[in-house]
Amino acid sequence: MPLYRYKALDAHGEMLDGQMEAANDAEVALRLQEQGHLPVETRLATGENGSPSLRMLLRKKPFDNAALVQFTQQLATLIGAGQPLDRALSILMDLPEDDKSRRVIADIRDTVRGGAPLSVALERQHGLFSKLYINMVRAGEAGGSMQDTLQRLADYLERSRALKGKVINALIYPAILLAVVGCALLFLLGYVVPQFAQMYESLDVALPWFTQAVLSVGLLVRDWWLVLVVIPGVLGLWLDRKRRNAAFRAALDAWLLRQKVIGSLIARLETARLTRTLGTLLRNGVPLLAAIGIARNVMSNTALVEDVAAAADDVKNGHGLSMSLARGKRFPRLALQMIQVGEESGALDTMLLKTADTFELETAQAIDRALAALVPLITLVLASVVGLVIISVLVPLYDLTNAIG
């Protein structure tokens, strides 16, 4: 069985640091609870030399998404166990493996010990914690339900991270497939095909038009391969720079939404983000207008962000959220209907979270369907291109062999 390291609080509030063999981290937590301890952290042990994980070495900022989720969950657990806030932060300060995270937690603890609320301490971390995070903590402080607020916040962050990871993971295999076959095609055109071109030129044989075309492309790739390699990189840098231009990005995002397949996927994904954020904020007591202002910052499509900004103005003037979002005609009808039901029933936060569940599931299913169709299509197209190149250079050789025979 794998070896796990754990940190736990005993009945006297002292931190225990140890190891045990278990099938999974849930078993470690259960065995610690049976011993009367409160599990704070469980993770697979590193190698014998205690070397840090690659993820820790590559982390550039104190808290990545996974670390922020872990920090929030652990803080909720400690507060729920009756630990004072400054004591809980002191315990958490010893858990991270990197010095940057320890310094951040220490600074937050010192600010709290100075009499400031947690939300103010987080706000002083120069943008490390999002407005959503800070406002939810502030709402929890006002409502006296810090543990529940932190647990909901951890759940929100975990769901957001999982959805983002789903999208990224779906793109990895097609990207690798394109890269591998693209390199093989470049090698075929830039090295193999020119060998045939020289051979046919020395034999002075008549070639079909399609063979001549492939040989010309092969010679072009051989002579200008460096330019052909650099062009995509330059184009990518140009597009990245253009996307920073507000007008260009707005036009591009609006155009993407009008595309049948990708536009529908983007709309579902952004709807899930918006409704998950709004529902979580409203459930924690953040006013609707403030929640809308925060929620639009988690969206990436500028066209939909503009629709949400316009909806905020309408809500300010007394209109309902569903009707205000409907004016842009970009959000899915089902989402608008579910939001309207929530407004009419007085359970807007609940319906927003249910809407998020629905569209997160739809997004995941849409990605799976797209991937199931895209990978075979890419494979078929690239295999056909490679096959046509091979056939086009071998057909004249076959004809020549038959003529000699």
Curated annotation (Swiss-Prot):
Q: Which residues form a coiled coil?
A: none
Gene3D superfamilies recorded: Type II secretion system (T2SS), domain F
Q: Name one Pfam family in it.
A: T2SSF
**InterPro entries, from UniProt?**
GspF/PilC, T2SS_GspF/T4SS_PilC_CS, T2SS_GspF_dom, T2SS_GspF_sf
Q: Which GO terms describe its cellular component?
A: plasma membrane
- What's the chief localization of this chain? membrane
Q: Does the keyword S-adenosyl-L-methionine apply?
A: no
Q: What are the GO BP annotations of this UniProt entry?
A: protein secretion by the type II secretion system
The segments annotated as topological domain Periplasmic are 191-218, 392-405
Q: Does the keyword Ribonucleoprotein apply?
A: no
Arranged from A to Z, the UniProt key words for this protein are: Calcium, Cell inner membrane, Cell membrane, Membrane, Metal-binding, Protein transport, Transmembrane, Transmembrane helix, Transport
**Residues noted as binding Ca(2+) in the record, renumbered to the chain:** 98, 151, 155
* NCBIfam families noted in UniProt: T3SSXpsF
Family affiliation: Belongs to the GSP F family.
Protein name per its UniProtKB record: Type II secretion system protein F
